[in-house]
Amino acid sequence: MKKKFYVVLRGRQRGVFDNWGDCQDSIAGYKGADYQGFCDLESATEYMEGNMYPSGRFLMVLRGRWKCYHNFDEFINAVSNEY
């Protein structure tokens, strides 16, 4: 059986995993987990590098209101819904 690789974009730990167990540990119970399986390491790495989001906290001010976003996706969704 061919080895499979897993990319976790959102989870407890982001990265490329070479087994389902480690991937599952990163995503199990994580709200909004984002992961995908690949048949080869090269494809998995390209996907991960093409979807790198800045990490850390983002602060955005919209029309006199403020809100902290803990991930870039939430930030982008708020901006695209407002404008």
Positions of PLM-derived features:
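Protein-protein interaction regions
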Residues: 1-83
